[in-house]
Design a protein with these regions (language model features):
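Long, positively charged amphipathic alpha-helical accessory segments at protein N-termini or as interdomain linkers
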Residues: 3-21, 32-164
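General beta-strand structural signal in soluble alpha/beta enzymes
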Residues: 22-26
Length: 164
């Protein structure tokens, strides 16, 4: 489900900004040119039950200065104030399309095409470093490290170049 939600939210953003390079930062952010426009959280409280939270900056123009990431919003990127109902409608359509992709077997290629950082050296929040190679069918991040290939299923990853 996280891959479905990620593709749906990213495609929603791209529907308002077709010229942009909106992409997915593993595991749960949608960014436009490195600025975070949306965050996704998917949890499973029990077998076959999923809860998804989606935070999408629509018309926000002011952000706290002490954020660890540089944020943006659809309004800042389009210079238009958007109706939240229109954004919601597009989001529901994009999520439905992403579910169709899952059923057809097209979801993983779609996710991979939106993923930022493939081929780049990245750092996990626990300090491990590696080259981002791929995302597997379960949404795990595939990294090539100095000791071999690992698959990471949770945590955060920095796409910033490591210090020299």
């Amino acid at each position: 489900l996280p891959l479905v939600i990620g593709v749906g939210v990213c495609n929603t953003v791209r529907s308002f900004l077709p010229w942009s390079s909106a992409g997915l930062k593993w595991p749960n952010d949608v960014r436009i040119d490195g600025r975070k426009v949306a965050g996704i959280l998917v949890e499973s409280p029990g077998p076959g039950v999923y809860l998804a939270g989606i935070g999408l900056n629509v018309n926000q123009v002011d952000f706290p200065e002490d954020l660890a990431i540089e944020p943006t919003s659809l309004m800042l990127e389009t210079a238009d104030r958007l109706r939240r109902a229109d954004v919601f409608d597009r989001l529901m359509d994009a999520l439905d399309d992403a579910l169709d992709m899952l059923e057809r077997g097209d979801l993983l290629p779609a996710y991979r095409s939106l993923l930022e950082g493939r081929g780049a050296e990245v750092q996990l929040e626990d300090g491990r470093r590696g080259v981002m190679k791929d995302v597997d069918a379960s949404g795990g991040l595939v990294l090539e490290t100095g000791t071999g290939v690992i698959v990471v299923h949770s945590g955060d990853v920095s796409l910033r170049p490591p210090p020299a």
